[in-house]
Amino acid sequence: MKKRILIIEDETSSVELLMLVLMREGYEVKSCQSGREAVSMIKEYHPHLILLDVMLPGMDGASIVRVLSDDEQLGSIPVIITSALVESQKLFATYPQVKDFCLKPFVLKDLIIKVKQAIGDL
């Protein structure tokens, strides 16, 4: 069974690139573009990993991580934060489900390694 990854990102070009790269690596990938949509999508899709942008319409990445951490089932899903802001790393440092941080623009080779580590494929 393929492992499922949910991309929560509002930039269409980033979503398309991430989906292409991750599907080539053999993952099942879905995406959503707003924070409000994200929470229901996580509950419905049950991803093995979430790639989460910090700046989102409706609900930001920090709010989504708080919702996840407050839920017994969802709190165990690993998260990789994606952001163009280096300062975002400090914001998420205290959340155990945040496994890594990937700075935009992406270095795809590094992103794939981080995904595989977070999802347990390395």
Segments predicted by a language model, with ranges:
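C-terminal output helix
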Residues: 106-116
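Short hydrophobic/Thr-rich beta-strand motif most characteristic of the beta2 strand and flanking loop
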Residues: 26-33, 41
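Charged docking surfaces used in two-component/phosphorelay signaling
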Residues: 16-24
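The feature encodes the CheY-like receiver
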Residues: 57, 75
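Conserved acidic carboxylate
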Residues: 9
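Active-site residues of response regulator receiver
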Residues: 53
